[in-house]
Amino acid sequence: MPKITGEIHDAMTGEVVQARVQVISPDGGNVAPTDAMWKVGPGEPFFYSNGQFSLDASRGYHRILVERGTEYPPWQKTIEVDGSSDSVIDIQLDRWADLPDRGWHPGNTHIHYDEKEKDPDRRLAYDSRVEDLRMTAVSILKRWDLDYATNKYPPGVLNEFTDTHHHVQSGEETRHNQDPSNPFQIGYGHVMLLNIRNQVDP
């Protein structure tokens, strides 16, 4: 079976970068590497790529969409797989803005992985890189008896996921619920506690 192989680069630096990838086959289905990790949540389905990917493809036209954070326009292309050889794609992502150079750094401080997440370490390693986030925080959350996968991380900096360009930490979400028995009455909302040394119990 022929393959589609791609490598994703920042067009300015030439660096191989992680991104979200969607490949639509001729029959309209989504195809991905056999060991791919899929995005969770609403919206279009994507799989996560560490900058390189290879997947089995059928003959015909395939639509490819690659996204990375908010500072890169989506990259799109339709290619034809004729079955005679593998298709190799060089994906160059053009950065439309360099906000960190202006002192603005993207981040997400409100992330939970629910009890259905089977590989939180792998997902957390992807999340900050694929979305090009300088700062990422998962939060401990007590909600009913749900075993949130991200509750396993201790408060503070998560060194195994942090590097020079990505700060990843675990904090805590505290909720003001008017009626704990009614999840739809959330009172004044949520407060995210960051840079804490210990979990704060109600």
Explain the meaning of each model-derived region.
Residues 79-102:
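Extracellular beta-sheet/turn segments enriched in Thr/Pro/Gly and aliphatic residues
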Residues 102-202:
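Catalytic cores of extracellular degradative/oxidative enzymes
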